[in-house]
Amino acid sequence: MTKKLTAQEKLNRKPIPTACVFCHEKHLQCDLGRPCQNCSKRGIGDTCRDKERKPRKRGPRKVKKEREVSASTKSEISNTINQQLIPVINTATAVSNRQNSSKIIKAKQTGVSTKKTRISKLAMDSLPLQMPVINSPSDMFGKQKKVMSPELPKIPSLTQLFNPTAEPIISDALLPSNQNSAANLPSLADKTPLEEFKNKPLSERAPQQGPQQPAQQLLPIPEKLNSDHTSSNSSTGEFGSVWTTEEYTKLNDMLSTPNLSRNNSKTYLNSNIAWSPSNMMKMDPITESQRPINTQELLNLTSNGLKRTHSRPHISLDQMASESKRHSANDTSPESQGGETVENLSPYRFRLLVKTPEDLYKHQALIQPHNYKSAYLELLRFLRWRFINSDKPSSGKSQRDGPEQLQNIAHSIKTHYAPIFVTLTNSLIAQDLKLQEIILQRALLEYESMAKLVNCTPMCIWRRSGEICFASNEFISLTGFNKKEILNKRKFIMEFMDNESIVDYYDIFHEYLAFGSTQSGPFNSSTGTSDGQAIFSECNLLLKNGCYLRCACIWTVKRDAFNIPMLIMGQFLPIFDIE
C-alpha cells in the first residue's frame, strides 16, 4: 500500500516552473534551490542549472490570436478616448453657461459649439498618435507601406559613378583637400612632356650638356613619374615587397649582364635583351653564341663596361643599397646602434643562438626575411670567376667552354626557373617572406636532429640560392673541411663542385626539381621520385686536397606553402672505381 505523504512532503513535491538539467533527464522531482537536493546528494551541485526550454513554434493559430488581440486593443483605445473626452466637454459647457447667462440662447449655443470644437481639438492633440496596425498582407504592401517606410536613397549605377561628365555623387566638402580635382587636372589639349619629347626631331632629343649632377638626380623618383603621367609604380618595384623585387632583380642581372672572354673579343650573353615574359623564348644558347658582333657594337660594350640592365629605369636597387649603407653609417640613433640582427649572422653563429624550436620562437622578433639579393650578387661574381676569369682550357677543350657553360646556366634560369618563380612570388608581402624564413629555420632544425640521431650518408643542406646552411659530420669527414670553414661565412654548394657538375645541377634543379617536373622524361621514370621532390644524379665533389671525388648523389627539395623551394638537401655517396 502506498505510504501516505505528510504535508511537508506534499509541499516539496509541488511542481516548479523550471527543473534542473539532471532532474529533467532523470524525471525526478526538482526543487527551487540551486543546487537542488538531488544534485547535492549525488555530488554534482556544481553542474546544477536550469533546463533551457525550446522556443515554441508560431503556428497559424498563434498569428490569428494576435490579430484578435490587436483588434480588441484598438477598440479599447477608442473607447478610452471617448470616455475621456465626455467629462472635459461637459465641464467646459457648464463654465460657458455661467459666464454667458445674460446672452441670448442663440449666441450661447453658438459659443458652446465653438468651444466644443476647440476643446476636442486640444484633447486630440494631447493624446499620443496611434500607430497603424497591419491586419493583412494587402495592407502591408498597400497604402500602409507608403506611410510606414521612409524613402530609401537612390544608389547610382556603375555607369553613373564612372562617368567623368556626370555630376559628382559625393559632396566636395567630404572630399580630402589633397586629392586632384577636375580643375587641377591638365586638359586633354595640353601635351605631356613625354608627348612633346616624342614629337621632337631626333636631333633635338639629345640631352644638353651641363654641369655634372649628383647620382641621386640621374634617376627619377616615383613622385616625378606620377606627376609626369608616365608611371605609377611604388618604390618597392613591381612586386608587393622589396625582398622579392631584389631577388628578381639579381636573377635578371644574371641573365642580362654581358660576359667577355679574355682571349677574344666576342660576347656569349646578349646584353641588349633584358629578361621579360614577352621575349622569354627568344634566346637560344647555340644561335646566340654563333652570332657575329661588329666592331662598333664591341666598342660600345667596352666603353660602357659591364653594366647591368635594369628592367625598371625608375629605381636602382644598387643605389638604394649604397644610400642605405651611407645613411646607416651616419645614423647614431640608439635603434641603429643596437645589437646585431639574426639576418646578418652566419649559419654557424645562428646555430649557437638558436639550438631548439623554443629558442627559435623566443627570438622570432629578430628574424627578418633573408637577403637573397646579396646572395645572388655574390653567386654571380663566383660564377664569372669560375667559368670566365679562371677558365684554363685543356688540350681537349676549346677556350669557349667556360662562357658557353655559363650561358647554358643563364638559359636554364631564363627558360625553366624565372617565369614560374616570378608568377609565384608576385603576390607575396613582407610578412609572407618573414614567415617563410621562420618555416625554413624550423625545417632546418628537424633536418639537423635527423642527421644527428640517425647514421646517414654525408649530407649538406643549402638554400635555393646555393648558400650552405648545414653540413653533417659525415660530410665534414668526407671532404676534409671543418664546420667553421663551411658555415662561419657564406659558402655556396657550387664551390664544392666542378664546372660540369655545376651545369648539371642547375639543369636538374631548374627543369625538374625546383617546382616539380612538368614533362615526362628519364628523371621521372628511372632516376626520380613520383612526387617530384627528389632526383638521383652524379657529381664530382671537391676535397680539401684539391682533388675531386666522384659521388652518387640525391637532391631533395623542401618547398613552402606557396610551392617555392626553400631548402635543398644533398646526400653524397662516394663511388670508388675498381681497377
UniProtKB/Swiss-Prot annotation:
Family per record? Belongs to the ERT1/acuK family.
Question: What GO annotations for molecular function exist for this entry?
Answer: DNA-binding transcription factor activity, RNA polymerase II-specific; RNA polymerase II transcription regulatory region sequence-specific DNA binding; zinc ion binding
Name the SMART domains for this protein: GAL4 (SM00066)
Q: Where are the annotated segments for Disordered? A: 43-75, 319-342
Q: Name one GO cellular component term.
A: nucleus
| A single BP term in Gene Ontology | cellular response to starvation
The organism named in the record is Kluyveromyces lactis (strain ATCC 8585 / CBS 2359 / DSM 70799 / NBRC 1267 / NRRL Y-1140 / WM37)
Which stretches make up the PAS domain?
A: 444-516
Name by which UniProt lists this protein: Glucose starvation modulator protein 1
